[in-house]
Structures are given as structure tokens and as C-alpha cells.
Amino acid sequence: MNKITLGMLGGTPCTISDAAPNHSILITGISGSGKTCHLQRIELDAIQTKHLIIVLDTSHSHDVDRIYNPIRSDYEANCKRISVSQEGIDLRLFSSESSPSQQPNRIINDVTQMIASSSNLGKRQTKMLRKAVASAYTNYTPGKNALQLIGSNLINLGSDGEDLYDRLWYIFQNDAALSGGSTFEKGNINIIDFSDFDPDTQKIIAELVLKSIWNNKSSLLSGNQECLIILDECQRLYLGPNSMICQILREGRKFGLNVIMATQSLSIFSKPTISMLEQAGTKLYFQPSQSDLQRITKSLQQANQANWKQTLTHLRRGECVADGILQVGKSTIRRPLILP
């Protein structure tokens, strides 16, 4: 199995051990700690090990001028940039290769829940949305824009439907779900740019993209290839208990799907969300915020917590503490390591 290089120790790659519960990674650290530069190095290395890389960029973190300068040339030579608002992306909302004979009601319910959950819709609004999705499913043909079709159906449901349309109008006003839009390229870092959308729309479209990846994983991956989904500034995405991120963390490894989630601080999340994020088998802790320091120190589970607190406080830019089941050369390491 091709492994992801987390960093180098004395010239030897430090990777995630096959004994780890999954190959997902949680990265935390304050702004300026070097976590995004490190993340981009991991992405470029993963391309060399034949991973399919899909980046969901909600904050311009992967704009050309923000790629780590020492690797920028190689990085740009190996990436495909997709502007969702300008080019659209083929989401295949109404198809699922994992179950071609899937009952229409299942597909309709999945699409409805993806939009409703990430939009915090109530029961009445969800019921109305389901009617619009069902009608769109019935009338959909290849080449049509699935989201615009759903929006048109909402308008036809009367004043309440129009109100819901107005609430979600931006997702119906672009080619985000255009059949025949951009698709992912194997062998490249696929950067999906959501930065033109407002935060609420980002959550909805990103959730639909993740669902599409999940539903069509077999055609995306070949042989033992794995897909690595990059979620920088992951606090911008929908992280509820029924979210696709939660599902990938729970079940993704057996299908070759893993996520790398990066955020400045865990303290902004609720306890259930933190527990969900910490299902990632490997953590990379860059210089933490003061609000995270005590939590991370305790999570390292070492006898001398005072030393780890000091180590975390004095991490230099680009340095991190890796925690998980790691592999260095032929050795399996079950204790935290400092990666330069």
C-alpha cells in the first residue's frame, strides 16, 4: 500500500502505519504555525504515491500565490483547478454507482437530507424540499442542471416554496451541479474552489460534492488506489452527526476514502464535534492556541505532561507533534513524535 509521508526524521519518511484505525488526519495550529504549507507538501507527496487528491478550498488557502513557494512549481504542474461557480462540477446527484438499481425514494431522500441538514431546515421546509427534489428526479435528463431544476420546482409549490427558494436561491443560480461539468483527474491534485460562495452555500455545495465522491468512489479509484480529501479550514463545512465527513471518518477506510481536516483551534467546536473530528487516526499538532493547549497536552497521554506542554508552546513555524500509530523505516511507533 502506498503510504502518505507526514514528514522526515533524519532522512527517513514518517508515515501512517497500516495498524492505524484509518488514514485520516486532523491538523490543528494557530495562524502562521506552518500547517497549511505542511498540508500542501503532504498533498504533493501523495500524488507521487498515486493517491487521488481532492481539495475543497473554501478560503483561498490553495490559490496559486498561497502555495508554499519551495514546492509551488511542482505543485502547479500537478494540479487541476475547478471553479465551481464558473465551470460547474458534475455532481451526479441523481445517480449512485454503488447501487445502480437503488430505489428512487432512496436517492430522493439522500439529496433532500444533504441540503436540509447542511441548511438547518425545519421539518416543514424539508418536506417541501423533498417534493421539489422528487419532481426534479422524475424530470431529470442528462445535460440538465439538477439544482436549478429543484429550484424551479420549489417556485411552483406556491408562496411557501418561493420563500424556501429565496432562502437557498444562490445554490440554484449557478452551474454547481451541471451535468457534464468538470470532473476529477486521476494523477492530479484536484482543487475545487468554493471561495466565490457565501458560507452557507459553501456548506451545502461541499456536502453534495462529498456525497458525490462517496456514491461514485468505485469509478474514481482503480485497484488499491486511495482518495485523500483535503478540508482546510474545516470549520466552514457541515460537521453534524449525519454529515458526509462523519460518514467518511466512520466507514471510509474500507473504501479507500480518507480526509485531512485542518483548523486553527478545536475550542470553537462543540464536544460532540470534537469527538467526531478526533476519530481521525493521526493528529498533527502545530503550535496550538492557548485554548487548545491543555486539551492537546492531555490527549498526548504521556507521564510527563509538563514537558509536552512546554514542547507544544515552543514549537517553531513548520514543526509539529505527530500522534497516532506511525511508521518510521521498519519501526512502528506508538508514541508522539516531533516532526521538523
Question: Where in the sequence are the language-model features?
Answer:
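Basic- and hydrophobic-enriched, low-structure N-terminal and domain-boundary segments
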Residues: 1-33, 37-44, 49, 91, ...
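P-loop NTPase motor core of the ASCE superfamily
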Residues: 14-16, 25, 47, 269-340
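Active/binding-pocket-proximal capping segment
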Residues: 227, 266, 279
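Short strand->helix junction
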Residues: 32-33, 199, 266
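P-loop NTPase motor domains
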Residues: 38-257, 270-272, 310-328
